[in-house]
C-alpha cells in the first residue's frame, strides 16, 4: 500500500492510501494517530471534525485531549492539533470522552464529557473559542452538569427557531434546553422514558433479563433535523455496539424507533459513535472503527461514508468500508 501525503501551509494533510486494485482507500480519514467519537460541523465552506484521541497501546479509555481536523474536499484533511485537553478544565482530571462543537453568534461552543474531581463521576463541560480550531477555554470554570456516571456523550442542536438543546447519557438519555448564552441550562434536566416503541426497549431498570427486545439504546446520541423531522441517532445493543435511530416531529419527542443504520459488523471496535452532516450537496455519516494498524477497542479511528436518505426521509443501511468517500471539488495545494 502506498500512502501519499501533502503539506499545505506547513500542516500535514492526510491524502489517500492506494490499494492493490488502484482503488482509493480513504478510511480511516486520519492515519497518524487514533481519533474517536467524530462530531462533524460545517462553517464558512469548510467541514470540521472534532474527535477524541485514544492513547497508543491503551487498555482503557484513558483519554487526555480532543483534536480537530478539517477538509474542503472530503479526502484531504488538515490536522489542527489539540486545542482542548483535560488540563483546560481545572475541575477535571481524566477521560476526555465524546464531544461536539457548534457555532452561535460568531462563537464556537465545544461540549465535552470528562471525569470531574468535584463529584468523582462524569460531567458535562463546555469550552468556548473565537475560531473553529481554537484556542478554546473553559467557558464557565465549572461543570455545566455534574454528578453521575451516566453523564457522557453530549450532542447539541440549534433549531430553526433559535432554541438550543443538549442530549447526553449512558444508559439513560438526558436532555435540557440551553439558554441563549449557550453556557447555562434553561429549566430542569429531563430524562427520556425509553420504551419499545421509542427506542426498541424499556428504560434500563425495566428491562427483563433474557428478553430479546427490538433494540436497546446504549450511548452516543446525535441529534439533527432534516425537512421538518428530528433524528436521534445512537450507539445501541450494548457490547458490541451498532448504530440505530429514532425519529420525531419535535426536538423533545415523542420518539419512534426506526431501526438500525449501521448494523453490527467487523469494524474492529466494540464501540461505535456517529455524527451526520450535509456538505456540498452530499450527506455524510461519520463513525469510528478499530482498523488502523495497532488499533482495536481502545485504539479507534474516524471513518466516513456518503449516503442518501430514502425517499420517505428514513436512513438506508450504511456499512463500513475501507474505500470511504470520493473527493468533492478540487484542492489547490498552494
Predicted regions: what they are:
Residues 1-26:
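Bacterial Sec-dependent N-terminal signal peptides
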Residues 23-334:
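Carbohydrate-active catalytic/glycan-binding domains of CAZyme proteins
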